[in-house]
Amino acid sequence: MDELRWYHITVCLDHIFGHNCSLSCKDCMNGGKCQEGKSECSCPAGCRVILCNENCLEGAYGAGCTSECQCVEENTLECSAKNGSCTCKSGYQGNRCQKDGLWGPEGWFSSAPCENGGQCNKKTGNCDCTPDYTRKSCTILRCISLTNLALSRRSSPMKYQQNVSSHREVRQRQQCSSDRPFKKLLCKFSFKIGM
C-alpha cells in the first residue's frame, strides 16, 4: 500500500515574506524595495541578501551583487560594489587597471619608458636599471665597472691601481694617490678603446 506523505506549505500574504512569513517590506534596508510575488527585497546596487543588509562580496557588484568585477586584481585597489568601476593602484590605468600608466600620489606623473632592460618602478615612476645602465630611462651606459682592484702599499703616498673594463670593451688604467688614508683621492685616467 502506498504511504501518504503530508507537506506543509506556508503561503505569505502580499508584502510579507521569509521563513514562516516573519519579514515584511518595511524590513528592507538600504533603499531596498519589496518585490511583488517574491520572498525578498529588491536590493539597490552594492547590497545583497533578503533584506539588503549586507554589502556585495569582494569581486561582485550591481543590483543583487550578481555581476562579476572585471578589474585586473593585482593592479586594483577596489572594485566598486555599485557599478563595477575599478580604482587602480599607483602605476596603472585603464577601465580595468590593465595598462601601465600613471604613478605617484593620485597618479600625478606619467612613467617614462625604460630602455636596455630597465623595469619601471610603479611606486616612484623611475626606471630600475640593469647594472650596466644608468639615468632616468636607462639610456646611459655605465662606462666603468670594476673587475679587479689591486691595492699596493709599497711606499708613501699610497697608490691604488684599478684595471677597469666596460660592456663596450673600453679599457682603462687608473692610478690614484693620497698622502693619507681616507682622504680625497687624486686620480689619473688613461683609456684604450678596442672594438
Curated annotation (Swiss-Prot):
PROSITE patterns reported for this sequence: EGF_1, EGF_2
Organism phylogeny: Eukaryota, Metazoa, Chordata, Craniata, Vertebrata
Residue ranges of domain EGF-like in the record: 86-97
Domain of life: Eukaryota
Family matches, as PANTHER family: SCAVENGER RECEPTOR CLASS F
Swiss-Prot/TrEMBL keywords: EGF-like domain
Gene Ontology MF terms in the entry: scavenger receptor activity
Name assigned to this protein: Putative EGF-like and EMI domain-containing protein 1
Gene name linked to the record: EGFEM1P
